[in-house]
Amino acid sequence: MKFQARVLTLYPEMFPGFLGYSLAGHALERGIWSLETVQIRDFALDKHHSVDDTPAGGGAGMVMRADVLAAALDHCPQDSPRLLMSPRGRPFDQAYARRLADDSGITLVCGRFEGVDERVIEARELEEVSIGDYILSGGETAALVILDAIIRLLPGVMGNKASAKCESFENGLLEHPQYTRPSLFEGREIPPVLTSGHHKAIADWRQSQAELLTRQRRPDLYARYDKNRQKT
């Protein structure tokens, strides 16, 4: 079944962007997923195609209008999750991507300006999601990131299923270091265990390295991993 992605945006020309290349691009050509962009401005109510207005109560910037965005949302099918790109949203992670990849599609709303009128978020039950604790010029970049994370998990996109299972975050840890030829680079050798041919020793080394890296670089992830490990 084809995964259907819809993006509501003021800049449809930004899509598919880098998703037109590599794994996602090939999957798009093969029909594993489809992309529809919806120009929010097409649902404006005045001759100037206005989509924003000044914030109630005063303040800097402009706010996207609830009536215009609601009309754009109502134009789309209601059978898939509807996510609003927002820095105050739930953090996006690998588990979130896996859950979304199991659905039949997704609708992504790309905000601009100072934000979106809260009433349309409530009335259309938009799920706010964030890709990090920083501010972007608009939601389009975040939407592309989220789609990329989802698409690579769709059946048939990655040639080797084991590749996805061994990546960072899939087992609660960062990925172990990777090496390839040449065997010697500027005086640095590939760890001998990786060329030993002993599969269990290699697996044990990779596991220990993944745990070490996670403990050093992401103590928050390691604490969660260690807690889950103690439960099993």
Swiss-Prot record:
Its main location: cytoplasm. It comes from the Bacteria. InterPro entries: Alpha/beta_knot_MTases, tRNA_m1G_MeTrfase_C_sf, tRNA_m1G_MeTrfase_TrmD, tRNA_m1G_MTases_N, tRNA_MeTrfase_TRMD/TRM10. It catalyses: guanosine(37) in tRNA + S-adenosyl-L-methionine = N(1)-methylguanosine(37) in tRNA + S-adenosyl-L-homocysteine + H(+). One of its GO terms (cellular component) is cytosol. Its EC number is 2.1.1.228. S-adenosyl-L-methionine binds at residues 111, 131-136. One of its GO terms (molecular function) is tRNA (guanine(37)-N1)-methyltransferase activity. Homodimer. Specifically methylates guanosine-37 in various tRNAs. This is tRNA (guanine-N(1)-)-methyltransferase. It comes from Bartonella tribocorum (strain CIP 105476 / IBS 506).
